Regions:
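Helix-boundary and membrane-interface capping/anchor signal
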Residues: 22-201
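Short, threonine-centered small-residue motifs that mark membrane-proximal processing/anchoring sites
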Residues: 1-23, 186-220
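Short, charged juxtamembrane terminal tails flanking transmembrane helices
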Residues: 222-226
């Protein structure tokens, strides 16, 4: 299946997924240069030995100045760590995006994401927000290679409003973002999750031309009036 075909299929499933979950898949997207060092990776998982299940989390705890890392999370440089909202460039809860990137072999590159939860902690380690229940998603094609393609998640409207109230108030830039995840049918390398602010949409060239024509028309109209 080609990437364009898979992205179209993924889009058709979004409505059903969004009706059942708090952290919902918004779509699949190609990424270039999104290896571990190129993005703000929060969580990296790898199934131990010959097993096919992996789970882990990274978060904070009151009274502990360091990250609390559990399960099969990898702890190498830039692999697993909480990051501040300011470091991630976050602006609002509604604009927060979690991107899942799987590294599975070409012959068996499907994977099941059983659970994915977003946690936001205060600078002191108190849990301010948890995204709650998640509906499992089976990815029949993950496109091999770290950084090739990612699956983008965001909060549903209710959870975005709750997160905004609880964790995006005054001074929210010092709050820290953590994640927890559970996957099965993991037969390859490592799976990574990074967090970013939703990028501003770049207008299509045709849209820019139309906008330019409209502006020229407005300018001509103003000149005629004067």
């Amino acid at each position: 299946m080609s990437k364009s075909q898979y992205f179209a299929l993924a889009a058709l499933t979004l409505c059903a997924i969004q009706a059942q979950a708090s952290l919902v898949m918004l779509g699949a997207q190609d990424f270039q240069g999104t290896g571990l060092g190129a993005v703000n990776t929060i969580l990296t998982l790898q199934s131990p030995g010959s097993t096919s299940n992996e789970s882990g989390s990274v978060g904070r705890a009151v009274g502990n100045p360091n990250d609390v890392i559990t399960g099969n999370a990898m702890t190498g440089a830039s692999q697993t760590q909480t990051r501040t909202a300011a470091e991630l460039g976050l602006t609002t809860a509604a604009q927060l995006r979690v991107v899942f990137n799987a590294l599975e072999p070409g012959a068996s590159n499907s994977i099941l994401l059983n659970n994915l939860q977003l946690n936001i902690f205060s600078a002191a380690g108190a849990l301010l927000f948890n995204s709650g229940a998640f509906t499992a998603i089976n990815f029949s094609d993950t496109f091999t290679g770290a950084g090739n393609s990612g699956f983008v998640f965001g909060l549903d409207a209710a959870q975005a409003a709750a997160a905004q109230s609880l964790a995006f108030g005054a001074g929210f830039g010092t709050n820290r973002i953590g994640l927890s995840a559970n996957l099965s049918n993991a037969t390859g390398g490592f799976e990574t999750f990074f967090v970013a602010n939703a990028p501003a949409q770049v207008p299509e060239p045709g849209s820019l031309v139309l906008a330019g024509i409209a502006l020229l028309g407005m300018a001509a109209s103003l000149r005629r009036r004067h």
